[in-house]
Curated annotation (Swiss-Prot):
This is Voltage-gated delayed rectifier potassium channel KCNH5. The gene is KCNH5. It is found in: Membrane. It comes from Homo sapiens (Human). Belongs to the potassium channel family. H (Eag) (TC 1.A.1.20) subfamily. Kv10.2/KCNH5 sub-subfamily. Residues 420-440 dip into the membrane without crossing it. Its main location: membrane.
């Protein structure tokens, strides 16, 4: 089977095992070189004993051993240590550190960077040696006499390697043998093991037992073994003296090949009892000397050389010829390689046929020897006519003749004919056919024939009759193994599993089978009774119970209850035991192998033999989410116990629960996330800070023309967006209230602005004259009409306007009122409930000039001094809304105060405005002509992209808008009529 043939040959990260093996007498720890403060990810037992700290206490502490600093620790040495870590260098220091019990100890500290396959420093290896005896004064009272001598002797004995390291290199003194780890650290980082996955390496001049060359060589040895098994019995039986030079050379070459095979066996790896590949030359030689060396050596002695000489005594020649049978021991090579050849069905069939033929050949040689011994009676020198050889000689026409001169019998069948006839008889007997042309006649021949028939029937029935049964019974596990492998291969091929994952699956199956030998542990345990099953489980988990102090106070019943709940898991390199985010539902004990804990793509811990990871279920009430990935670096054996099973046992054995909770220390708690900062991130932050510090900031002043231009574009965009959303007729009417002060008194007035809006405006806006009495300076209404459409919308704005005393008269006062309105335009809480006095009126001039404009059915507002409106169609009935509050954009549930406005105050204000307006218009008439063309061009450009805002205070000033521009919205300012209205009309 491949598992037994190849062994465990998957790439493994054996860094931890190599360091532990090389530093068996040293104390060391490993720190992550990619995380700030270089936290400790592993510490061996030697360091824990030397420092007094438990491994769980040291984990995640700084590799600089800052937790062991004290008052007497040299500050300069501390700085040098940090510089060594910062620069990823190798260095050594003498530093004074403090144990856990605060005992000061001098250490010889060595630091070496560990690189991965990309030549990136990922770990730091720090080794420690206690040199306190060399640093303390020797001539004090406590060190005199025999005490001083004993201390020096112990120091020189236990710290020989440290003394050599402390000795200057330029002194020509006798240098003792260094420790292996010290040699590694002194020779440089090239010899240090790398933290990476790699295939098992073989030393020089060592051949892998599963390589192509060794496989071919084994098949050659198999063929030569069968050659030896055939020729040795033939030469012994037929007493052939090797006079033929060709056969002698061939046999000599075969002997040389077997001698070479012995030499190769001293340099060939083998599979250990645990499935591992043994490549140590010393172990290989010892294993071969204890097993097959003696047998192989006896089978390779050159026995044919004795027979090659002419003058050799017949007895000696016969003896050495008989010793050739020892070469049949070479068949042991076939036996020990049989599991290699049984891997293929065709090879099994060929081997079985060859075995049958080989047995027939041996029996044929024996059959001829019996006939040759009985055919001539050496005592009487007569021939036995009842021998099968004599009968054969007569049947084939080559009878025996007696040579009287020599006194011997000559003639008879040739040796070839004799061998073929002997083989023919044995084959017919073994296959139970028996034609009878060659039959035994003497008693010895008959007895041999009976034995041969028994052997033949057994061979025939075994090999040819029960081949399927033999395979099923003898190779049941092998067949099941191959069946499982075939099923897995078909599954991987069917679902197109990636190649890398497929190799991991196959390697896991092979390694698991190699460890369990195909035995179903659960099935075997289910056969055993409860008591026996518990005893077996305690034996299987004995390593966990003996190594961890948490189980020392457990009773036999408690251990048996725990052992039954434990499960054994075998992990291949690269397998993930826990994924980040998974529920941690088991407590894991590492029995063999090494694992790494990866958080945020960084190694935060390396777990080895004796470590425990998982969660403290006995202290937490909820399941934890794994904060990191736990991945196997090598082939690992884990003993795990589920959360529910553990809590069940702890609840029953309360006394053990307290001891277990107190003594069990998790090497890695997957519930707690480790907070760290990567060195690369710190460097990036520093570079970003320096970049921002050196970056030149550009700022544009507030009054810069470019900033003003962009602000203007932004305001125009907002106006367009607001104009496009005015679709609710109830929101298009706002009533504005204003208060004015005249001669120190508060005068209240109401200005009604009516906005009629139809479809979206397509042309530029302009003001047009709407009143018949425009020549008189009593302007009743000024309208901004749109370009068609009958769907008009009215907008009323109510806003309080405070008229301050001393702000002017007439037009000046109106301008002041408008300025006050702009200052108070955000105060929407002063909206009144006064009825509107402004009514829409028809404009015959505008209807004549613009055919597309629909005539307004509303008449001009009729008013009198008493403020009574005579119009039969009021503005509050023109739209759908019936209440002025419904025209306001403020929420309906808000309460608004009302301020009644007398019509007399409004009339007085408008009269003053009329006179003031008359004077101002005369002054502006000359300027309007020049500005008319410019304004028209500006409005023409902006008309396609902008929509005027009806509620804007600027839109209420009629002096800045040129007349006779069609398709405009209507702004009408209603006031009471006066007798002088016709005189107050002014042409724009």
């Amino acid at each position: 089977m491949p598992g037994g043939k190849r062994g465990l040959v998957a790439p493994q990260n054996t860094f931890l095992e190599n360091i532990v093996r090389r530093s068996s007498e040293s104390s060391f720890l490993l720190g992550n070189a990619q995380i700030v403060d270089w936290p400790v990810v592993y510490s061996n037992d030697g360091f824990c004993k030397l420092s007094g700290y438990h491994r769980a206490d040291v984990m995640q502490k700084s590799s600089t051993c800052s937790f062991m600093y004290g008052e007497l620790t040299d500050k300069k040495t501390i700085e040098k240590v940090r510089q060594t870590f910062d620069n990823y260098e190798s260095n050594c220091f003498e530093v004074l550190l403090y144990k856990k019990n605060r005992t000061p100890v001098w250490f010889y500290m060595q630091i070496a960077p560990i690189r991965n396959e990309h030549e990136k420093v990922v770990l730091f290896l720090c080794t420690f040696k206690d040199i306190t005896l060399f640093k303390q004064p020797i001539e004090d009272d406590s060190t005199k006499g025999w005490t001083k001598f004993a201390r020096l002797t112990r120091a020189l004995t236990n710290s020989r390697s440290v003394l050599q390291q402390l000795t200057p290199m330029n002194k020509t003194e006798v240098v003792h043998k260094h420790s292996r780890l010290a040699e590694v650290l002194q020779l440089g980082s090239d010899i240090l093991p790398q933290y990476k996955q790699e295939a098992p390496k073989t030393p020089p001049h060592i051949i892998l037992h599963y390589c192509a060359f060794k496989t071919t060589w084994d098949w050659v040895i198999l063929i030569l073994t069968f050659y030896t098994a055939i020729m040795v019995p033939y030469n012994v039986s037929f007493k052939t003296k090797q006079n033929n030079i060709a056969w002698l050379v061939l046999d000599s070459v075969v002997d040389v090949i077997f001698l070479v095979d012995i030499v190769l066996n001293f340099h060939t790896t083998f599979v250990g009892p645990g499935g591992e590949v043994i490549s140590d030359p010393k172990l290989i030689r010892m294993n071969y000397l204890k097993t097959w060396f003696v047998i192989d050596l006896l089978s390779c002695l050159p026995y044919d050389i004795i027979n090659a000489f002419e003058n050799v005594d017949e007895g000696i020649s016969s003896l050495f010829s008989s010793l050739k049978v020892v070469r049949l021991l070479r068949l042991g090579r076939v036996a020990r390689k049989l599991d290699h050849y049984l891997e293929y069905g065709a090879a099994v069939l060929v081997l079985l046929v060859c075995v049958f033929g080989l047995v027939a050949h041996w029996l044929a040689c024996i059959w001829y020897s019996i006939g040759d011994y009985e055919v001539i009676d050496e005592v009487t020198n007569t021939i036995q006519i009842d021998s099968w050889l004599y009968q054969l000689a007569l049947s084939i026409g080559t009878p025996y003749r007696y040579n009287t001169s020599a006194g011997i019998w000559e003639g008879g069948p040739s040796k070839d004919s004799l061998y073929v006839s002997s083989l023919y008889f044995t084959m017919t007997s073994l296959t139970t056919i028996g034609f009878g042309n060659i039959a035994p006649t003497t008693d010895v021949e008959k007895m041999f024939s009976v034995a041969m028939m028994m052997v033949g029937s057994l061979l025939y029935a075994t090999i040819f009759g029960n081949v399927t049964t033999i395979f099923q019974q003898m190779y049941a596990n092998t067949n099941r193994y191959h069946e499982m492998l075939n099923n897995v291969r078909d599954f991987l091929k069917l679902y197109q599993v990636p190649k890398g994952l497929s190799e991991r699956v196959m390697d896991y199956i092979v390694s698991t089978w190699s460890m369990s030998k195909g035995i179903d542990t659960e099935k075997v345990l289910s056969i055993c009774p409860k008591d026996m099953r518990a005893d077996i489980c305690v034996h299987l988990n004995r390593k966990v119970f003996n190594e961890h102090p948490a189980f020392r106070l457990a009773s036999d019943g408690c251990l048996r209850a725990l052992a039954v709940e434990f499960q054994t898991i075998h992990c291949a390199p690269g397998d993930l035991i826990y994924h980040a985010g998974e529920s941690v539902d088991a407590l894991c004990f590492v029995v063999s192998g090494s694992l790494e804990v990866i958080q945020d793509d960084e190694v935060v811990a390396i777990l080895g033999k004796g470590d425990v990871f998982g969660d403290i279920f006995w202290k937490e009430t909820t399941l934890a989410h794994a904060c990191a990935n736990v991945r196997a670096l090598t082939y690992c054996d884990l003993h795990i116990i589920k959360r529910e099973a553990l809590l069940k046992v702890l609840d029953f054995y309360t006394a053990f629960a307290n001891s277990f909770s107190r003594n069990l220390t998790l090497t890695c708690n997957l519930r707690k996330r480790i907070i760290f900062r990567k060195i690369s991130d710190v460097k990036k932050e520093e570079e970003e800070r320096l970049r921002q510090k050196n970056e030149v900031t550009l700022s544009i002043p507030v009054d810069h023309p470019v900033r003003k231009l962009f602000q203007k574009f932004k305001q125009q965009k907002e106006l367009r967006n607001q104009g496009s959303t005015q679709g609710d007729p109830e929101r298009n009417q706002l009533q504005v209230e204003s208060r004015s002060l005249q001669n120190g008194a508060s005068i209240t007035g109401t200005s009604v602005v009516t906005v009629s809006q139809i479809t979206p405006i397509q042309t530029s806006l302009a003001y047009v004259k709407t009143s018949e009495s425009l020549k008189q300076n009593n302007r009743d209404a000024m309208e901004l009409k749109p370009n068609g459409g009958a769907d008009q919308k009215c907008l009323k704005v109510n806003s309080p306007i405070r008229m301050k005393n001393g702000n002017g008269k007439g037009w000046l006062r109106l301008k002041n009122n408008m300025g006050a309105h702009e200052e108070k335009k955000e105060d929407w809480n002063n909206v009144t409930k006064a009825e509107s006095m402004g009514l829409l009126s028809e404009d015959p001039k505008s209807s004549d000039s613009e055919n597309s404009v629909t005539k307004n059915p509303l008449r001009k507002t009729d008013s009198c001094d008493s403020g009574i409106t005579k119009s039969d169609l009021r503005l509050d009935k023109a739209g759908e809304a019936r209440s002025p509050l419904e025209h306001s954009p403020i929420q309906a549930d808000a309460k608004h105060p009302f301020y009644p406005i007398p019509e007399q105050a409004l009339q007085t204000t408008l009269q003053e405005v009329k006179h003031e307006l008359k004077e101002d218009i005369q002054l502006l008439s000359c300027r309007m002509t020049a500005l008319e063309k410019q304004v028209a061009e500006i409005l023409k450009i902006l008309s396609e992209k902008s929509v005027p805002q009806a509620s804007s205070p600027k839109s209420q000033m009629p002096l800045q808008v040129p007349p006779q521009i069609p398709c405009q919205d209507i702004f009408s300012v209603s006031r009471p009529e006066s007798p002088e209205s016709d005189k107050d009309e002014i042409h724009f």
